[in-house]
Regions:
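Catalytic metal- and UDP-sugar-binding loop of GT-A-like glycosyltransferases, i.e.
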Residues: 97
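Active-site-proximal specificity loops/subdomain of glycosyltransferases
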Residues: 44-90
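Short glycine- and hydrophobic/aromatic-rich loop-to-beta-strand nucleating segment
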Residues: 133-141
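Short aromatic/hydrophobic "clamp" motif used to bind/position activated sugar donors
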Residues: 94
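Conserved donor-nucleotide/metal-binding helix-loop-beta segment in metal-dependent transferases, i.e.
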Residues: 101-130
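Surface-exposed amphipathic alpha-helices with a cationic face
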Residues: 26-30
Length: 247
């Protein structure tokens, strides 16, 4: 059994996602996580967020002027600013959640599963790469992730496409990476939507034993709900169970 101190951490920046994504994530967590916990959102705009959500500014990546931050921002989840006095002062186990996921089962086991650093094993790659929609670590560990990234920015950008590739490569080299059980976190596109031609008449379903459905790329939950796939070549029928869970 893991220690009782638990934190859900999420991030919202820019204009791609509105405050309703964070508010709905907060509501889903309250329904599905029964152990004592904090819900913390790092954001550049608190407008529209529920008052009972703890909000803090996003720590700076501290990149050189002109260097693009897109694709790397989540690395600040390892910033010492998140555990230092005057900030969120995070303690214990931290579970990072992307704000565009849909929770469909109990979350308690994400804090009970043993491991130093746990992440989804990416569904498309056959190597160590993780999908960082859901990952857990202990507050204050792995400050070297951000330190190494800042000190070796160009080399990291040339070698890795985004933060999840770099993150899992860096921690795999230390032997710290474990993966969630395969059935817990499923891809909407790969595991819920039926293969063509069955997708033309069969509604996407929640996979057996799934706890979280991940919406990576397109469609997002509100689009999938009404049957908009976001891609001309991918047919997605309206998916009622999203409305039942994404609230």
């Amino acid at each position: 059994m893991r220690p009782s101190m638990a934190t859900i951490l999420c991030m919202k920046w820019g204009t791609k996602y509105g405050p309703e994504y964070v508010n709905r994530l907060h509501s889903m967590v309250r329904r599905h996580l029964t152990i004592p916990h904090r819900f913390v959102c790092l954001t550049d705009n608190r407008t529209g967020l529920n008052e009972d959500i703890e909000t803090f500014s996003i720590p700076s990546l501290e990149l050189p002027a002109g260097a693009p931050e897109r694709g790397w921002t989540k690395l600040v989840s390892f910033s010492p600013a998140l555990t230092a006095p005057g900030g969120p002062e995070l303690k214990g186990d931290i579970l990072f959640l992307d704000i565009d996921i849909v929770i469909v089962g109990s979350m308690n086991s994400f804090f009970e599963q043993p491991g130093d650093f746990l992440i989804i094993r990416d569904w498309q790659k056959g190597d160590y790469t993780g999908n960082s929609s859901v990952y857990r670590w202990r507050a204050g560990t792995y400050p070297d992730v951000l330190e190494y990234f800042r000190a070796n920015l160009e080399a990291v950008r040339q070698r890795h496409r985004n933060e999840q590739e770099f993150l899992t490569a860096h921690l795999s080299a230390q032997g710290k990476v474990s993966y969630w059980p395969e059935t817990w976190c499923r891809s909407f596109k790969r595991h819920c939507v039926k293969y063509f031609p069955f997708s033309l008449w069969q509604t996407p379903e929640i996979p057996d034993a799934a706890k979280i459905v991940v919406f990576h790329g397109l469609p997002n939950p509100p689009d999938a709900l009404v049957g908009r796939s976001g891609k001309w070549y991918r047919r997605v029928l309206p998916t009622p169970w999203i409305a039942e869970n994404w609230k």
